[in-house]
C-alpha cells in the first residue's frame, strides 16, 4: 500500500471495493480517518468490515470527514431478526450519510428500476427534495 496515506490526505472521494480478508479488515480506521480531508467522502461498495464500524461512526458524527455513501452494512435483517439495524451505531441518523442496500442487479426488472430511480433521486437531491425509496429515515 505504498502511497496510500498520501492519497487519503489528497482525495476528495475515497472508494473502497475491497473484500473482507485478514489484510483488509479494519483497514479504514481512526488513524486513516485522521489522514483524510475534512470534506472527503468515503464510499464503501465492497464489504463493511473493511471499515472499522465505531471509528466510521465517530468520524462522521464529529464531522471529521465530510460524509459517507455506504452500500454495505454491518448487519442485515434476517427472518429471526427482521428489525436488525445496519450498524450497532445509529449511522443512519447522521445527516452526512447516504445508505443503500447491497442487493442490486437481482433481476432485469430491478436493474431497469435502478436506471430510472437513481437519476431521479440525484435530481431530487440536487433540488433539496426528499429522496424516493428511503429504507431508514432518521429515527429508524
Model-derived segments and spans:
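Rossmann-like dinucleotide-binding domain for NAD(H)/NADP(H)
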Residues: 39, 46-140
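Alpha-helical segments flanking ligand/cofactor-binding loops in enzyme cores
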Residues: 5, 34, 54-58
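Rossmann-fold NAD(P) dinucleotide-binding segment
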Residues: 23-42
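Structural motif corresponding to alpha-helix initiation and N-cap regions
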Residues: 1-4, 30, 53, 84-85
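Structural alpha-helical scaffold elements that stabilize or flank donor/cofactor-binding regions
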Residues: 6-10, 32, 90-91
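Adenosine-nucleotide cofactor-binding segment
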Residues: 1-27
